Amino acid sequence: MLKKIISLFLFLSLVLSLASCVGASKKPSDYESVEDIPLPEYKKGQTVSLKVYNWGEYISDGSEDSFDVNKEFEKYFNEHLSEKYGGIKIKVEYSMYPTNEEMYSKITNGAVSYDVIIPSDYMIQKMQSEGLLLSFDTGSLSNYGNISEDFKGTYYDPDNRYSVPYTYGMLGIIYNKDKVDPEDVADKSWALMWNEKYSGNILQFNNPRDAFATAMYKEGLSVNSDDPEVWNKALLELQKQKPILQGYVNDEIFNKMENESALIASYYVGDFLTMADNQENLAFYYPKEGVNYFIDAMCIPSCSSNPHLAKEYINFMISEEAAVANALYIGYASPNTAVVENEEYIEAMLEYSYEGENGENAYELLYNNTPDTVNAYYNSLFPDEIDPACYRSFSDETQKNINALWESLKKSSTTEPWIHVVSGLIVASVLTLEVYSTYTKKKRSHSYRLRDKQKKKTA
């Protein structure tokens, strides 16, 4: 009997002890903001891993002696911030994702935790609404003043509490000016993507959000509608387009447009500049009906183990040196005024071979065409919405409907005359390697030019 009493006493003591531990150990997600979270009790000399999750090829990575942002952050932290955190050392663990959705899946399944992520606007909106992001005082970042006021107070983060802008860009149409009739592009319309004259030479996005958007901008439909009928109308347009397509593509577009095996495609302006640097016959315009305008921004997920260190990383990323290196490497426009006004950056951008109809250079293509100007007509169709051309997150029901429509489009009986499944798989494997090599090499070359100029300047 005594043994049972002692056993029961020990059991209850253990339960109470565990309960006490659980109650005392709060997770970062239990706090309203990063600033409310107590600093962990790091040990002096301890190496702490900061886990960063970003898009592929979306940071200056030190290849061939270029500016390595992650290594430079480690160096900066260990020299200047270590004592602030008890004498620890930082090691950046960097991993990449191909889509917002895959990143979201990784975060929600809880298998891996990350400290910094860089999702797109609509995904930030979704994750914030689901409690997957930590709030933090962006104004306390010493470099936050570098971010242009135009990129603060956005629809997805109106109070600037969950994100810091990293890069932005707009969608448009790329065409071969040597082989596409000037009269067919004079109107600057999405209709070019449906022009039967170029049957077999048109490329469409191989993802539902962007592909449907091309049809929706063309027809003046809301890209953020929850109405199934709106999406059915867009589907009809894509069904009309399908017989004249060469195929649905992702990164294969680089090789196809550069070697002139395709003549017309829709893609993002930063990537167009990469292609134009390799093929002088390529030109670009923003369709008059409206285009997608995206912002990718740095956030701290609620699963972060080191939210305070994540803030230090984000602050470093918007410093002039890191932001310029990243902007040159990525090729998209920067929301960072320290980049836009940087002389070396401007000079490097002018080295792109692109020249527009009226002598417009690469820098002007990125920065002189503001989203409000490009989307003036589309915005007028939805006067009660803020930035209606930007993608919003959908309800689960709407997303399921879109996915089903996309599957029906891809599986429809209409034959894609220029793409065959077996040969396509073989070609895709080869193209993936070629595209990766070309794309990476071109982006890095501009980073090297900036690096060399900076070395000469300080020599």
Model feature map: region roles:
Residues S17-S20:
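C-terminal motif of bacterial Sec signal peptides marking the signal peptidase cleavage site
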Residues K27-K126:
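Early extracytoplasmic/lumenal segment of secretory-pathway proteins
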Residues T47, K51-N70, V112-S261:
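Extracytoplasmic ligand-binding site segments that recognize negatively charged/polar headgroups
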Residues M123-K126, I264-N281:
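A ligand-binding cleft/hinge motif common to bilobed small-molecule-binding domains
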Residues N146, G169, N232-K240, N278-S302:
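Periplasmic-binding protein-like
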Residues T370-A459:
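Conserved C-terminal helix/tail region of periplasmic/extracytoplasmic solute-binding proteins
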